[in-house]
Amino acid sequence: MRLGLLILLLVPLEGGGAQASPAQARVSARANDRYDPTFRRYSKRYFGAGFDWFLFKAQAMAESELNPDARSWVGARGLMQLMPSTFQAIQTKRPEFASIDDPEWNIAAGIMHDRYLWRLWGREIGEGQRIPFMLGSYNAGEGTIGRAAAAARASQLDATLWPNIEHVAPSVPRWRYRETLGYVKKIDGNIARLRSNKPRG
């Protein structure tokens, strides 16, 4: 499956200072693979066998650095940094998702929420552009990205193209757009890192 814009935006994540050797980078990128089976399982369940599960691991890396105990200042929790209200809404459909603090259920709920956003944007956006809209909505809320799309249309731009959302982002009120645009790019960089360290064969 094409990942569209995301696989084209290869943004370096490392800042200045000493750089890790290629061997160290491989170890670092693969050090926390304990949740890989869970990412694989729920990626397949909610997006199908052909979908690249690295996307969701890369998202969790951006959200929590794969720390199941992560807490944000706004109250988001766990690997996928879910708000308790979002998790509770998902629990009404999946009561077996017992606890937001259980890594498996946190991942499962995060990917299930991604699927909701994927389908939401699928009504008007093709697969090649849909991933950044999904991720942007996960970060900022679908209403915010919807307002950005409306601003793009008002500017006579194609609102189904993520670069046009980036273009109008500064004009969208009540949106910390730099955080959202950086979030999408960071996930793309994480995917590149994961793929570069994927074993051959």
Stretches with model-predicted labels:
Residues Y46-F56, A70-R71, W121-L135:
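Surface-exposed patches in mature extracellular/periplasmic domains of secreted proteins
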Residues G16-P37, Q88-M112, Y116-G201:
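Non-catalytic cell-wall polysaccharide-engagement segments
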Residues P68-D69, R147:
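Short, hydrophobic secondary-structure boundary micro-motifs
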Residues R2-F47, P68:
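N-terminal export signals and maturation junctions of secreted/periplasmic proteins
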Residues A70-I90, R153-Q156:
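Short, surface-exposed glycine/acidic/tryptophan-bearing loops
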Residues D36, W53-K57, M80:
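Short amphipathic alpha-helical segments
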